Amino acid sequence: MRDDQVNNVMRKKEARKFFYESTGRYPVIPAVKNDEWLESAIKSDREIVYVLYGNICTIQEIVRKLKSAGKMVIVHVDLISGLASKDICVDFIRQFTEADGIISTKAHMIKRANEVGLFTIQRFFMIDQLTYDNIKKNVRDTDPDVVEMMPAGLEKMIKFALEEVEGKPLVASGLVLDKTDVTGALSAGAIAVSTTNRPMWDIE
């Protein structure tokens, strides 16, 4: 194994360890989609932050601010303006930002991120039976570090999905309206809930 491959393996191992330990302390992950929310996340005691906005000109600075505040930074690459849905955008995040990992719905992006040592979260929208039927195959194929399921309020679906992802940790997100959505998702087996609903960020 080449030195860069060894470094990538170690990088992912350390990121996984931190993610699992941090979600044990703080099960709600702030997801920021503008500069105002970014500042709120920086000031919070949450240790992991999802970045859901930015473009190729601003993402480096957004990530830098969060890293300077000691945060683990996960960039949703599908939402960054100016980045095409190609492997090269993953390489850009790896080489030109300090991000720890990515979120994506796209299998090839998750695979490439694994190759370059980024922590990976594959997001699934549980909108129909076909999505549910294919989740096991997709997860086996891409091998993400974490599976994310939307929306968060479907406790029964979270339990079913956990059976399909064969031991992968699951984060719930989307339509987190109140505390019961958070506690329900966690009680169903999710290790964390990510949300843009700022009043929910302080739930422990």
What are these regions (language model features)?
Residues R2-V73, S81-L83, E98:
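Conserved N-terminal beta1-alpha1 strand-loop-helix module at the mouth
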Residues F19-E21, V63-G70, R94, I110-G117, ...:
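Surface-exposed amphipathic alpha-helices with a cationic face
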Residues E21-V28, A69-D78, E98, V116-F125, ...:
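Short beta-strand/loop segments at the ligand-binding rim of alpha/beta enzyme cores
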Residues I29-K33, I48-I56, I74-G82, E98-A107, ...:
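Catalytic beta/alpha-barrel core
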Residues S40, I88-I93, K137, K156-G167, ...:
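Catalytic cores of alpha/beta
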Residues K43-V49, F96-A99, E115-I121, R140-V146, ...:
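Glycine-enriched alpha-helix->loop->beta-strand junction motifs that scaffold or abut catalytic
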Residues V51-Y53, P151-M157, G174-D181, L186-E204:
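Glycine-rich phosphate-binding active-site loops on the catalytic face of alpha/beta enzymes
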Residues A107-V139:
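Histidine/lysine/aspartate-rich catalytic loop segments that bind and position anionic ligands
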